[in-house]
Amino acid sequence: MSNPLHVHVPWRLLESTLPFLIDRGLQPEVAFQGPDLDRAPAASLDNVGRALGAAGLAVTVHAPFHDLNPGALEPLVAEATRRRFLQTLEAADRLGARLVVFHPGYERWKYGGRDHLWLEQALRFWPPFIDLASRQGCAMALENVFEREPPPLANLLAQLDSPFLGHCFDVGHWHLFCSLPVDEWFFALGSRTIHLHLHDNFGRADDHLPVGEGSIDFGALFGQVGALAARPSMTLEAHDRPALLRSLAGVAPFLVR
């Protein structure tokens, strides 16, 4: 069975972190900021992709998200988002990535209860990306961020209904923002869940603590994951090496079940 586990690595640190990743057999989820995509040389992306492939390590990618929104009503914001996401898929292709995580841009306070405004724009935005991703053989996953309930993401994914566009369940964001128990979230979106983001908090801030160091019930989460028809890949979103090592230890018992 293929290794499902990845670890968060910013693009700016990836080349210097490669020896550590290869030595430990850790697969990166490469996180890009917008300016990274303007500056990253194609040759560097190709070289890193080849090095990881030669080591037998798979790659996932996290797209930039600051100030971007694929459901934006403002055409200039939508165009900036389109440009960055196209750059992200190009970088992912050079790295040999087979999955890219995107933020959906939904914030209920922005739309004043008129979620259909965001949904209508998102339904127009994603089809060209689905076509491109299918040609690259690269899946895309929309991550829950501020969603209190599943319908915004569930409705979008159901209407687009593509095997190349699924859901990334971020357990830290769910614990912080969602009003539903994890089994109800998975009842709505489990069949479309293809990736997980794993980090911990106490329900007060997006702390990105190592797995097991906050108040999230990871046993309940992995109970839901174990019932899925296909096991999702997953990324530990630790933001420094000591936290990563503790998170690896924290998640290990759930990966051997």
Regions found by a protein language model. Give the residues of each.
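Charged helix-capping and loop-helix junction motifs
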Residues: A42-N47, V77-F85, D115-W126, S179-A188, ...
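Active-site acidic/histidine proton-transfer and metal-coordination neighborhood
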Residues: G71-G166
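Acidic-and-aromatic substrate-binding clefts and catalytic sites of carbohydrate-active enzymes
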Residues: H8-S16, F32-D46, N69-A72, R108-G112, ...
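Conserved radical SAM core fold
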Residues: F65-N69, Y106-W109, D200-A205
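Alpha-helix-loop-beta-strand connector modules within alpha/beta enzyme cores
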Residues: V48-H66, Q121-R135, F218-V225
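Histidine-acidic metal/acid-base catalytic patches
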Residues: S2-P4, E15-I22, R98, P150-L165, ...
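Hydrophobic faces of well-ordered beta-strands that scaffold small-molecule active sites
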Residues: N3-V9, P28-V30, V59-A63, V100-F102, ...
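N-terminal pre-domain/capping segments
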Residues: M1-D93, V256-R257
